[in-house]
Amino acid sequence: MEKVIVAKARTVSQDMTTICCTRYGNVLCSRGSVVPLFINQIKEGKPVTVTEPEMTRIIMRLEEAVELVIFAFANAESGDIMVQKAPACTIEVLAQAVKSLFHSENEIKIIGIRHGENMYETLLTNEACA
């Protein structure tokens, strides 16, 4: 998607329109986030399912995502891809943290990586910076 945005940014008047993109990791508790799944599994007394314990994901709070958009409005130039530095965490550490918050004794069940999933999440590659 960023390539489309950057390409479009090159075709419009820089004086009148700024087209940029913000890129996030995983926004906690948003649609598609694994955290609500972990919470439901804990509340239902089921094992907490983890695809691959060492798989990493970049996590950010909703407030951080909103701050990134506001920062982009104030500072971006056309064609920019705005990325906030955010720490990566393993899925196992995230599952343990949710278990800890709920004082859960639920076991963690490793279910294996799914087709097409990446072991390590990267928000910005060297190629994207070029």
Model-predicted regions and their roles:
Residues 75-130:
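Mid/C-terminal beta-alpha module of Rossmann-like enzyme folds, strongest
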Residues 1-76, 87, 91-101:
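NAD(P)-dependent short-chain dehydrogenase/reductase
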